[in-house]
């Protein structure tokens, strides 16, 4: 509880300082809105949840109107994109006074604040992970952290302008001197930021001193603000050994600080210093994460050497715990910031919980051995800082490229080294506080002079940091675990690069440029709309391509060329015209061809069947003019006239061909005559004659005469030839009906009987005996077909006169009157019936 009370008092004092800074346009509140755009530009800074964020929630409670006014004032004051305050987010996240005061407070808690810087980067990534896992709690923390970063960003911008001239080391010892009692003094003197913020400011200032002492490139990368980077670069030379040990300690703290509860407690205990340190770390981490290739170790040390970073940029809160209360606050701050940093996927392989971070921070409290060496080297580094700043300003652009190439692997490696160093830093933290406080006081005096130069340089680095932030974050996530063992080597290379190159501070300035788009639109704003314009330009080009006019017509050839071409092609044109004229007479041919196509069936037999003589295709008929010599001569004359007409139409121009290559006249005037090799001859191939046919009379043979005589005799006998013919036909039909049973003799007998009946009226009994009974039945059936009346009369006569004589039969027949045509048939039938009946009677009678 005692630790929480000083934190509350620090928060009240930070609020009072913020109110004082509002008229000076450097209050923490306006700085927060500026840091917000920076967070938007760099994904890491936007989402980083730090102790500062938890402590910054008090200023967030203030009305938004005041915050907006302060933001506008800060933007007005910050004409240049105040990039240096980004690295100072942890150290001097608020106005220059607040930055120095916070740095002094951070010296009290220097050790915890240093890990917080690396954790700021990790916190950014971890806050994103915590937002997904923990829900609104992590989101509220991230928003509070963003606002705290925003408040710190403008302050860093102002402080960065102030700090570059003199390193923040003097302000850091002030924070160290503050300890628990001095922290209260800083609360009154610090900016209106919550006590955690001044502690974080002290932590970033200490981080600035220590990375300079360590001379590792990690520290320059961490101070995303120019001022913080300059302080870090100066302090890296002094804190080379301490930075490596503290980086290892920070890793240990982050591994232990994976739990969420101790982090919140640390934030409540040391909110001002840790939040400021974490904000600086957040800004530095996005820059380092964005610039992993440009400054590999800086980003990792921003995570894992936050003690050095905060000592160099501002008093390191983790290494400064002189008193028990300050040590606890600093350790909590370090655990919160450092644990948050490693919780992020970029710094730690697993999603670190806040509890593990608190444990690591508690371990960092005792780690002060490395800070003793840092205090010894800080005094020397402070002198070198000014020289390094000058060199860095000259070589910012070139060094940024080099740092962008290195950082990804070194960041994770440095974290492990920092954790190891932090283990022994707590013992010597008391000495470091006094030295860092003195250094911070010196820095507080000088910062106003150095501010104008640093903000100009960082915008260049802003572009680099923005380009590299996303890559660094991804690289940190992938490479955070394996490269940890290489801590000592990489920090040394980074320190050398950081001392020579102020590229790291410029990168944080790049992040600020997006946040302060109005003040520095050149580096980022014009480029982005330029890219949008480029995107819109292809659309316009597409529309223009669609609406392109037709290609321009080719220019007319010169008169000489045209004449020469005409000379070459005129004969072809004349010949083509002649062909057209000759084919004009053949225009009806298509009709004939159509006929031939219609008669496709006939065409199929071409070459297969023998054509009739004289048949040919009408299309193949020769021209009559070709056959006659006179006609061919006339055609030639017509062709010549046509050629003359064509040449007359052509403009008369002298055609100049190749000189010295004229053809002889015999060749030039040669006339080509084409004669057909076929000769046509006409003649009669076949003819037709039509004649009347002559009917030849047939010769009558002897047999025919005999037949005719028989017929004549029959006619005379019957009195009518037709009757005999009818009788013969009837007899033949009867024979057919009787079938094979009737013999020829029977038929003859019947015929003879009929003839006898016609002639004599006598009927032979022998004939009746020969007729079978079946024949009689059939004749009866045939009689039914004949007239019924006649049959009845015949039947009556036959029944009454069965056994009459021939004479009686003849008399009765004469009485009957029958048609000549029907008589013979009926007579025959009657006779047959009578004969059949007589036959039956004869059969019945006994012999």
Swiss-Prot record:
Tell me where on the tree of life, at the top rank, the source sits: Eukaryota
Note whether Membrane occurs among the keywords.
no
Where do Polar residues bias regions lie? 89-98, 130-146, 186-224, 280-291, 309-323, 564-575
Q: What is this protein called?
A: Altered inheritance of mitochondria protein 21
Q: Where is the composition biased (Basic and acidic residues)?
A: 10-20, 54-78, 225-258
**Which Gene Ontology cellular-component terms appear in the entry?**
actin cortical patch
UniProt source species: Candida dubliniensis (strain CD36 / ATCC MYA-646 / CBS 7987 / NCPF 3949 / NRRL Y-17841) (Yeast)
Describe the family membership recorded for this protein in Swiss-Prot or TrEMBL. Answer: Belongs to the AIM21 family.
Which residue intervals make up region (Disordered)?
1-665, 716-775, 793-821
Alphabetical keyword list: Cytoplasm, Cytoskeleton
Acidic residues compositional bias: what residue ranges?
A: 370-386, 417-429, 632-643, 757-772, 807-820
Q: Does the keyword Cytoplasm apply?
A: yes
Residue ranges annotated as compositionally biased, kind Low complexity, are 464-481, 747-756
Known function? Involved in mitochondrial migration along actin filaments.
Q: Where is the composition biased (Basic residues)?
A: 653-664
Where in the cell is the protein located? Cytoplasm, Cytoskeleton, Actin patch
Give the gene symbol: AIM21
């Amino acid at each position: 509880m005692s630790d929480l009370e000083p934190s509350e008092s620090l928060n009240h004092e930070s609020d009072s300082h913020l109110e004082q800074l509002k008229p000076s346009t450097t209050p923490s509140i306006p700085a927060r809105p500026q840091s917000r755009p920076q967070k938007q530009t760099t994904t890491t800074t936007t989402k980083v949840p730090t102790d500062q964020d938890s402590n910054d929630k008090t200023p967030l409670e203030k009305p938004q109107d005041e915050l907006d006014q302060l933001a506008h004032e800060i933007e007005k004051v910050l004409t240049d994109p105040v990039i240096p305050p980004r690295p100072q987010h942890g150290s001097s996240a608020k106005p220059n006074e607040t930055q120095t005061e916070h740095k002094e407070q951070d010296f009290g808690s220097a050790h915890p604040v240093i890990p917080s810087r690396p954790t700021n980067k990790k916190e950014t990534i971890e806050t994103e992970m915590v937002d997904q896992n923990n829900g609104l709690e992590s989101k509220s923390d991230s928003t509070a952290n963003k606002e705290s970063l925003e408040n710190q960003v403008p302050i860093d911008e102002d402080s960065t302008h102030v700090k570059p001239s003199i390193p923040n080391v003097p302000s850091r010892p002030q924070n160290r001197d503050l300890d628990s009692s001095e922290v209260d003094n800083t609360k009154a003197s610090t900016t209106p930021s919550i006590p955690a913020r001044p502690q974080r400011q002290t932590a970033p200032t200490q981080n600035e001193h220590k990375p300079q002492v360590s001379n590792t490139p990690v520290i320059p990368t961490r101070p995303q603000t120019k001022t913080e980077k300059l302080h870090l670069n100066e302090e890296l030379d002094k804190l080379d050994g301490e930075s490596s040990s503290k980086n290892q300690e920070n890793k240990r703290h982050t591994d232990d600080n994976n739990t969420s509860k101790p982090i919140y407690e640390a934030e409540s205990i040391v909110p001002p210093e840790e939040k400021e340190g974490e904000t600086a770390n957040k800004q530095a981490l996005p820059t380092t994460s964005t610039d992993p290739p440009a400054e590999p170790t800086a980003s990792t040390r921003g995570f894992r050497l936050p003690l050095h970073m905060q000592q160099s940029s501002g008093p390191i809160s983790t290494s400064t715990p002189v008193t028990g209360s300050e040590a606890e606050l600093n350790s909590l701050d370090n655990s919160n910031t450092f644990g948050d940093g490693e919780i992020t996927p970029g710094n730690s392989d697993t999603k670190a919980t806040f509890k593990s971070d608190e444990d690591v921070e508690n371990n960092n409290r005792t780690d002060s051995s490395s800070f003793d060496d840092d205090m010894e080297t800080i005094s020397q580094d402070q002198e070198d800082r000014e020289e390094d700043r000058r060199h860095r300003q000259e070589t910012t652009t070139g060094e940024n490229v080099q740092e962008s190439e290195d950082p990804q692997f070194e960041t994770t490696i440095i974290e492990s080294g920092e954790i190891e160093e932090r283990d022994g830093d707590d013992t010597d933290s008391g000495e470091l506080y006094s030295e860092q406080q003195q250094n911070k006081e010196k820095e507080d005096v000088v910062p106003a002079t150095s501010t104008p130069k640093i903000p100009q340089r960082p915008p260049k680095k802003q572009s680099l940091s923005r380009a590299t932030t996303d890559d660094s974050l991804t690289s940190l996530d992938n490479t955070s675990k394996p490269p940890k063992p290489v801590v000592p080597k990489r920090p040394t290379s980074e320190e050398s690069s950081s001392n020579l190159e102020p590229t790291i501070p410029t990168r944080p300035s790049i992040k600020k440029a997006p946040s302060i788009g109005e003040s520095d639109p050149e580096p980022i704003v014009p480029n982005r709309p330029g890219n949008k314009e480029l995107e819109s330009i292809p659309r316009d080009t597409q529309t223009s391509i669609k609406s392109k006019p037709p290609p321009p017509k080719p220019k007319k050839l010169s008169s000489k060329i045209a004449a020469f071409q005409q000379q070459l092609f005129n004969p072809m044109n004349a010949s083509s015209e002649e062909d057209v004229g000759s084919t004009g007479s053949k225009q009806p041919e298509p009709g004939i061809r159509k006929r031939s196509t219609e008669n496709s069936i006939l065409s199929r037999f071409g070459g297969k069947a023998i054509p009739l003589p004289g048949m040919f295709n009408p299309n193949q008929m020769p021209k009559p003019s070709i056959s006659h010599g006179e006609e061919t001569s006339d055609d030639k004359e017509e062709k010549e006239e046509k050629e003359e007409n064509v040449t007359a139409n052509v403009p008369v121009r002298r055609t100049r061909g190749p000189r010295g290559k004229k053809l002889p006249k015999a060749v030039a005037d040669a006339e080509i005559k084409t004669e057909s090799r076929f000769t046509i001859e006409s003649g009669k191939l076949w003819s037709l004659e039509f004649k009347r046919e002559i009917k030849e009379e047939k010769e009558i043979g002897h047999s025919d005469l005999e037949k005719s005589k028989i017929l004549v005799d029959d006619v005379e006998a019957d009195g009518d030839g037709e009757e005999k013919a009818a009788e013969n036909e009837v007899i033949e039909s009867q024979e057919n009906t009787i079938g094979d049973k009737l013999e020829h003799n029977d038929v003859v007998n019947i015929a003879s009987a009929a003839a006898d009946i016609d002639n004599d009226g006598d009927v032979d009994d022998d004939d009746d005996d020969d007729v079978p009974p079946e024949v009689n039945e059939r004749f009866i059936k045939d009689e039914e077909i004949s007239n019924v009346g006649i049959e009845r009369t015949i039947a009556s006569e036959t029944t009454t006169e069965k056994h009459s004589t021939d004479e009686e039969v003849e008399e009765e027949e004469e009485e009957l009157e029958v048609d000549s045509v029907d008589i013979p048939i009926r007579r025959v039938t009657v006779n047959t019936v009578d004969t059949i009946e007589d036959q039956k009677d004869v059969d019945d009678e006994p012999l």
